[in-house]
C-alpha cells in the first residue's frame, strides 16, 4: 500500500486515543521542510488539520515514527492556546509580542516533546513503510 495511505489509516486509528474523534487530520502528499520530520497545521475551520511529513520520516524506525505522530497530534490540542497568543499580535507592542510568542512556541515544543515520548506508548504499533 502507498505509504501516505498507510499513514492516513494509522492517524485515523490514533485520533480516538487522543480524544480527537471529531477531528479530520489529513496526511498531505506534500512534504514538510527538510529540517522537520513532520508538522501539523490546524485549520481555522473547526475540527480540521493537515499533517505533513518529510521524505526523511519514512527512513526512521517505527518507534520514532510513532513518537513523531504523537508529538504532532498533541499540537492539535495546543492549537487553541497558540491561536490566543497569535491574536495578541498587533495588540501588544512589537517587542512584547515577539518575546511572548518566542517563549510560548519554545515551551509548547518542549511540552510536546516530553509528552510524546510517554503518550506514544499508548498508540498501536506503527507499520508504515516508504513508497
Positions of predicted regions on the chain:
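Metalloprotease/metallohydrolase-associated module, dominated by Zn2+-dependent proteases
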Residues: 1-63, 80-131
